[in-house]
From Swiss-Prot:
This protein is involved in the repair of mismatches in DNA. It is possible that it carries out the mismatch recognition step. This protein has a weak ATPase activity. GO terms for molecular function: ATP binding; ATP-dependent DNA damage sensor activity; damaged DNA binding; mismatched DNA binding. One of its GO terms (biological process) is mismatch repair. Belongs to the DNA mismatch repair MutS family. InterPro entries: DNA_mismatch_repair_MutS, DNA_mismatch_repair_MutS-lik_N, DNA_mismatch_repair_MutS/MSH, DNA_mismatch_repair_MutS_C, DNA_mismatch_repair_MutS_clamp, DNA_mismatch_repair_MutS_core, DNA_mismatch_repair_MutS_N, DNA_mismatch_repair_MutS_sf. The lineage of its organism: Bacteria, Bacillati, Bacillota, Bacilli, Lactobacillales. Pfam families: MutS_I, MutS_II, MutS_III, MutS_IV, MutS_V. This is DNA mismatch repair protein MutS. Keywords: ATP-binding, DNA damage, DNA repair, DNA-binding, Nucleotide-binding. GO terms for cellular component: cytosol. It comes from Streptococcus sanguinis (strain SK36). ATP binds at G602, P603, N604, M605, S606, G607, K608, S609. The keyword Repeat does not apply.
């Protein structure tokens, strides 16, 4: 259809739509939001709503779909959850007063990273990330638009950037145009992120300060620009950007956090079965968010850790006070989110009452902590600001029975505003006047069933049935005729109605004005509310630590400056909670100054992986400031944890199990220090036996000679146990088994020395393989053992000269005159390249063959 034939309303739609080509445009028309053209077609499919058309009789009808205004939020949620943007175009004037087309403007763009209203409120953070890049350095900024949290850092490695984005569970990333195309493809393709672009950076001195580097300032500025561009309002709740360094926390990449089930179970994707699930005895949404953050970022500063431990100890020593505290915390609402709604101008009366109720609980919480009388609680007590001015204003102004909707009246309490009270008096007296008038006219007219009714169309009226029409007084005038009755008015009734309607309208308008003033006044306290929220969250998390310590029988760990780690009867607290304390077998571990590496052998399913994860979880809990699951625990402060636990291909990136193993091993070898913890489980199983064994041994030797990190290395290569003879800082341990009458029992107990068998056939039996197959396997095993075809003699040890292998793997890099293509291939640093970069490089080399 030609543009000139469009109606003014459709032309207005197209004019607005061209400014938001990447968003669904919800175009307000009366009581509906309408969508047109491709937006309508696509939205109808996603939202499962009817697709109709505008101008159905035209040659090219315009596709149209719509959703009701009052229930639009649930449809917006579906679109945003599906990864789309939604632009909201509102009517900016009353259609009854409009001259021509009703003026409409986009008032907000809702995106996956900027959701502030939702029909399904969630206590989790929703982070929006911005990136900037120059000369090998990345600036990364992130923000939660609801809580106002705003953090900025610099990173030198794109892998770290991806890991940080994954840790934040971000769904949208804001970019300039400087990021390499291959890296953009990784973000959009492999990580399935929505990419949004801005060219300019907002330089807000108040929010950005002077401490940020130029790259960080660019990233943070682009984030602010995008947020202001989409939200189109003042965002007074945003906190000042805080610089952080990942090296200031216990470093763990995304794969490590996933393999350790820190915030969700890797298999189910649910909270159940994670460390977060175990540790979460918080009573507030703010506490839940802070707990998740502490789990993701354990500390490396012993003083800060001790501060948290001291508070936990105080709470453990004061059971009754802690019980009172938890009860008080149950009455605390999510004031971070409430403060953001104040800032957005979206707070309703019920939410202001929730704010006042929370502030009303603060003095009681403060009194409980003061009553304990511990100096370790001083900082928390100081941060408990009850903001009495705001609490008093809301409590005196807002009616306890106030509705959610701010235009329906009955919001403001009687006695708060004298003028409003006068209007309400007129309404109350008017009701009495109408009742008196009804009695008077019934007596004067002799109509026994005469009564006064009301509806929106006719207002107040006398209701007279047809049988009584002959008795209608002469001063009655007809207002409406029905089948069995008629409706009449009088001058006196009209006067009373006029006074009441005027009072009702003025009362509603005045209530709205008063409420808006109160909401504006509340906006002045946003920073104090946010500071209070942080203190309440910390109190909540620390009481949660105490509750878990009590329930799970945890102990306070001790940190030592020596490189000595000793845990007596340690437990994997999550596994223990799932299994039950009676079923779990604790294990001790000692890695002193003379022992850096434990080489763990034993059958599959015997508990090697649990033993390794147990140590990592204890370290993480300790450096969070929590107590730990052990009889006693003494350990050094670690700067990083590196893991390779569990075998799974990275199908999204097109990387095999072995490639993933090698890349994770490479990260550990390159980045670990002697203050790190390395956990490698069955490294090398993804390739040929000799290759895997050779690589496993070389990696162990490298860690032993050059890294010095505390390391647990589980392996099925029993030949590697000979390394204990040549590597002075390595010791063998194994998982004990009990073999009796042909039956094998896994004891799940770690004992010194190497394992003598792998019991693979027994594991296969447990898995339910056919009996004939198992008998054949046992026969083959007996034959191999009688031939003594062990592989140990084929592997060089650190002190033994290398011997030629009988079955040598073909080399890609043969000696002699070398093809220049092979030279280029060898020089590729594939472990620091993305899969797409590797593919592109190989494609270029292929052209040269």
């Amino acid at each position: 259809m030609a543009v000139e034939k469009l109606s003014p309303g459709m032309q207005q739609y197209l004019d607005i739509k061209k400014d938001y080509p990447d968003a669904f445009l919800l175009f307000r028309m009366g009581d509906f939001y309408e969508l047109f053209y491709d937006d309508a077609v696509n939205a109808a499919q996603i939202l499962e709503i009817s697709l109709t058309s505008r101008n159905k009789n035209a040659e090219n009808p315009i596709p149209m779909a719509g959703v009701p205004y009052h229930s639009a939020q649930q449809y917006i949620d579906v679109l945003v959850e599906s990864g789309y943007k939604v632009a909201i175009a509102e009517q900016m004037e009353d259609p009854k007063e409009a001259k021509g087309v009703v003026k409409r403007e986009v008032v907000q763009v809702i995106t996956p990273g900027t959701v502030v209203d939702s029909s399904k409120p969630d206590s989790a953070n929703n982070f929006l990330v911005a990136l900037d890049y120059s000369d090998g350095l990345y600036g990364l900024a992130y923000m939660d638009l609801v809580t106002g949290e705003f953090q900025v850092t610099s990173l030198e490695d794109f892998a770290l950037v991806c890991g940080e984005i994954r840790n934040l569970k971000a769904r949208e990333v804001v970019l300039g145009y400087a990021l390499p195309e291959a890296e953009e493809q990784v973000l959009a393709g492999q990580m399935n992120l929505l990419l949004s672009y801005v060219q300019t950076a907002l330089d807000d001195v108040q929010l950005l300060g002077e401490e940020l580097s130029p790259m960080e300032r660019q990233a943070a500025g682009k984030l602010l620009e995008y947020v202001h561009r989409t939200q189109m309002r003042e965002l007074s709740h945003l906190k000042k950007a805080q610089h952080y360094e990942i090296k200031d926390f216990l470093q763990m990449d995304y794969a490590t956090k996933a393999s350790l089930d820190l915030t969700e179970n890797a298999r189910s994707g649910k909270k159940h079965g994670s460390l977060y699930w175990l540790m979460d005895e918080t009573k507030t949404a703010m506490g839940g968010r802070m707990l998740r953050s502490w789990i993701q970022r354990p500390l490396i500063d012993e003083a800060r850790i001790s501060q948290r431990q001291n508070v936990v100890e105080v709470f453990l020593d004061h059971f009754f006070e802690r019980s009172d505290l938890t009860e008080s915390l149950k009455g605390v609402y999510d004031i971070e989110r409430l403060a953001s709604r104040v800032s957005f101008g979206k707070t309703n009366p019920k939410e202001l009452l929730q704010l006042a109720a929370t502030l009303g609980n603060v003095p009681q919480i403060k009194a409980i902590l003061q009553g304990i009388g511990s100096p370790h609680l001083a900082r928390l007590i100081e941060g408990l600001d009850p903001i009495p001015e705001l609490a008093g204003l809301i409590s005196s102004a807002i009616s306890p029975d106030a509705p959610h909707i701010i235009t329906e009246g009955n919001i403001i309490q009687t006695g708060f505003d004298e003028t409003l009270d006068q209007y309400r008096l007129v309404l109350r007296e008017g009701t009495g006047w109408i009742a008196e008038l009804e009695v008077k006219e019934r007596a004067n007219s002799g109509i026994s069933n005469l009564k006064i009714d009301y509806n929106k169309k006719d207002g107040y009226y006398f209701h007279v049935t047809n049988s009584q029409l002959a008795h209608v007084p002469s001063h009655f005038f007809r207002k409406a005729t029905l089948k069995n009755s008629e409706r009449f008015g009088t001058e006196e009734l009209a006067r009373i109605e006029g006074e009441m309607l005027e009072a009702r309208e003025k009362s509603a308008n005045l209530e709205y004005e008063i409420f808006m003033r109160i909401r504006e006044e509340a906006g002045k306290y946003i920073q104090r509310l946010q500071a209070l929220a942080q203190t309440l969250a910390a109190v909540d998390v620390l009481q949660s630590f105490a509750a878990v310590a009590e329930q799970q029988h945890l102990v306070r760990p001790v940190f030592t400056a020596e490189r000595r780690l000793q845990i007596e009867k340690g437990r994997h607290a999550v596994v223990e909670k799932v299994m039950g304390a009676q079923s779990y077998i604790p294990n001790s571990i000692l890695l002193d100054q003379e022992t850096d590496i434990q080489l763990i052998t034993g059958p599959n399913m015997s508990g090697k992986s649990t033993y390794m994860r147990q140590l990592a979880i204890i370290v993480i809990m300790a450096q969070m400031g929590s107590y730990v699951p052990a009889q006693s625990a003494s350990l050094p402060l670690f700067d990083a944890i590196f893991t390779r636990i569990g075998a799974a291909d990275d199908l999204v990136s097109g990387q095999s199990t072995f490639m993933v193993e090698m890349m994770e091993a490479n990260r550990a070898i390159r980045q670990a220090s002697e203050r790190s913890l390395i956990l490698f489980d069955e490294l090398g199983r993804g390739t040929a036996t000799y290759d895997g064994m050779a690589l496993a041994q070389a990696i162990i030797e490298h860690i032993h000679h050059y890294t010095g990190a505390k390391t647990l290395f589980a392996t099925h290569y029993h030949e590697l146990t000979a390394l204990e003879e040549s590597l002075e800082h390595l010791e063998n341990v194994h998982v004990a088994t009990l073999e009796k009458d042909g039956q094998v029992t896994f004891l799940h107990k770690i004992e010194p020395g190497p394992a003598d068998k792998s019991y693979g056939i027994h594991v296969a039996k447990i898995a339910g393989l056919p009996e004939k197959l198992l008998e054949r396997a046992d026969s083959i095993l007996s034959h191999l053992e009688s031939q003594d075809t062990g592989l140990g003699s084929e592997l060089p040890t650190a002190s033994r000269p290398k011997q030629s292998q009988v079955a040598e793997q073909m080399s890609l890099f043969a000696e002699g005159t070398e093809n220049p293509v092979l030279t280029e291939l060898r020089d590729l640093d594939i472990y620091n390249m993305t899969p797409l970069e590797v593919m592109a490089a190989v494609a270029e080399l292929k052209k040269k063959l």
